[in-house]
């Protein structure tokens, strides 16, 4: 923007020093009409950021159109196209941000309605962007034609360009108003869905609130009773709980006593079984080794008898006398 204003000032100063001739009568007659065509629509509202961005887009274009031929020749370059593209992108960005803000603040609608409205909004955004691109392309075309007619009369070209701009402006305003209406419908539908959700939540929470109110009423009634009565009721409740715990403890002790008795009986039975098995095993061992011992005793006795008999049969030798 600073570059454009600098070019405007330099061109105006150059025109003053060159003693430029006054504009033709036809151009002076067309200028009020062009100014009237470029005035904003009375019914157009700029309450939302995207609407303000669209207004800035048209303000910039109106400023370009109100310049003289010499100034337009100096400023209608690629930078103007870039500025218009930036303003167009800003408008589309603000539209998306506004829709996202509605979704975040008011909550989603039903899936079917949300899909249908989202599709309609996308189509309206696409039409508005297409119209703004047509404006930018028409401005680029006008710049080329203006450069081609350098040094010639451009009243007819300016009149034709103003007519095209008027038609394009009507298209842009029509599609912008359509987008406004659809966003308003979307906002109303989202609010209605949020109200239905709140009503559903209220219906679900109402019984819980009634129960809480009843409990609070009971607690309040208890709080109004005398302290002695409440203490007596609490003592009876504690006494009942202690008696219940005592009976449970006695029951557990009886069960433990019975279990210990059963264990003692089982241990005595197992000890008797072990004793009987030991006696049986001892008897079996005795039955195994007694015949063997008796046989060994007989063999030993026989061996002793044989040794004694052999010793008895050996003759005793006489002692040898010395000469």
Curated annotation (Swiss-Prot):
User: Which residues are recorded with the post-translational modification Phosphoserine?
Assistant: 153
Q: Does the keyword Oxidoreductase apply?
A: no
Q: Which GO terms describe its molecular function?
A: amyloid-beta binding; antioxidant activity; cholesterol transfer activity; enzyme binding; heparan sulfate proteoglycan binding; heparin binding; identical protein binding; lipoprotein particle binding
- Identify the stretches annotated as sequence repeats: 86-107, 108-129, 130-151, 152-173, 174-195, 196-217, 218-239, 240-261
Q: Which InterPro entries match?
A: ApoA_E, Apolipoprotein_A1/A4/E
Residues modified to Methionine sulfoxide: 149
Q: Where is this region: Homooligomerization?
A: 272-323
Report the main location listed first in the record: secreted
Q: Which SUPFAM superfamilies match?
A: Apolipoprotein A-I
GO CC, alphabetical: chylomicron remnant; endoplasmic reticulum; extracellular exosome; extracellular matrix; extracellular space; glutamatergic synapse; Golgi apparatus; high-density lipoprotein particle
Q: Where does heparin bind?
A: 168-171, 235-242
Region Lipid-binding and lipoprotein association: start and end of each range?
216-296
Q: Which residues form a coiled coil?
A: none
Q: How is it modified after translation?
A: APOE exists as multiple glycosylated and sialylated glycoforms within cells and in plasma. The extent of glycosylation and sialylation are tissue and context specific. Glycated in plasma VLDL.
The residues that cross the membrane are: none
Its localization reads: Secreted; Secreted, Extracellular space; Secreted, Extracellular space, Extracellular matrix; Extracellular vesicle
Tell me a GO biological process for this protein: positive regulation of low-density lipoprotein particle receptor catabolic process
The protein's matches in PANTHER family, at most eight in alphabetical order, are given as: APOLIPOPROTEIN (PTHR18976), APOLIPOPROTEIN E (PTHR18976:SF2)
Query: Subunit structure, per the record?
Result: Homotetramer. May interact with ABCA1; functionally associated with ABCA1 in the biogenesis of HDLs. May interact with APP/A4 amyloid-beta peptide; the interaction is extremely stable in vitro but its physiological significance is unclear. May interact with MAPT. May interact with MAP2. In the cerebrospinal fluid, interacts with secreted SORL1. Interacts with PMEL; this allows the loading of PMEL luminal fragment on ILVs to induce fibril nucleation.
Q: What does this protein do?
A: APOE is an apolipoprotein, a protein associating with lipid particles, that mainly functions in lipoprotein-mediated lipid transport between organs via the plasma and interstitial fluids. APOE is a core component of plasma lipoproteins and is involved in their production, conversion and clearance. Apolipoproteins are amphipathic molecules that interact both with lipids of the lipoprotein particle core and the aqueous environment of the plasma.
Of which family is this protein a member? Belongs to the apolipoprotein A1/A4/E family.
Name under which the protein is recorded? Apolipoprotein E
Upper lineage: Eukaryota, Metazoa, Chordata, Craniata, Vertebrata
Q: Which gene encodes it?
A: APOE
């Amino acid at each position: 923007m600073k570059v454009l204003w600098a070019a405007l000032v330099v061109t105006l100063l150059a025109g003053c020093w060159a003693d430029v001739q006054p504009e033709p009568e036809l151009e002076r007659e067309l200028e009020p009409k062009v100014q009237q065509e470029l005035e904003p629509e009375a019914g157009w509202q700029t309450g939302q950021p995207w609407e303000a961005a669209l207004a800035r887009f048209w303000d910039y274009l109106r400023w370009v159109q109100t310049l003289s031929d010499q100034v337009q020749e100096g400023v209608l370059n690629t930078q103007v196209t870039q500025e218009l593209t930036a303003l167009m992108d800003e408008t589309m960005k603000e539209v998306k941000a506004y829709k996202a803000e509605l979704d975040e603040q008011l909550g989603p609608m039903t899936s079917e309605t949300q899909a249908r409205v989202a599709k309609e909004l996308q189509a309206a955004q696409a039409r508005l962007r297409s119209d703004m691109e047509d404006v930018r392309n028409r401005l680029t075309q006008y710049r080329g034609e203006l450069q081609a007619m350098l040094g010639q009369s451009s009243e007819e070209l300016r009149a034709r360009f103003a007519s095209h701009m008027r038609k394009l402006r009507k298209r842009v305003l029509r599609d912008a108003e359509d987008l406004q209406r659809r966003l308003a419908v979307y906002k109303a539908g989202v609010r209605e869905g949020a109200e239905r959700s709140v009503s559903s939540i209220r219906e679900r929470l109402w019984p819980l609130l009634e129960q809480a109110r009843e409990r609070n009423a009971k607690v309040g009634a208890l709080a109004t009773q005398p302290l002695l009565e409440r203490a007596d009721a609490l003592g009876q409740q504690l006494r009942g709980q202690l008696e219940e715990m005592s009976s449970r403890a006695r029951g557990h002790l009886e069960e433990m006593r019975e279990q210990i008795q059963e264990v003692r009986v089982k241990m005595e039975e197992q000890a008797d079984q072990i004793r009987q098995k030991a006696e049986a095993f001892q008897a079996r061992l005795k039955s195994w080794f007694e015949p063997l011992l008796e046989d060994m005793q007989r063999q030993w006795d026989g061996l002793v008898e044989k040794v004694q008999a052999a010793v008895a049969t050996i003759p005793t030798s006489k002692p040898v006398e010395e000469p």
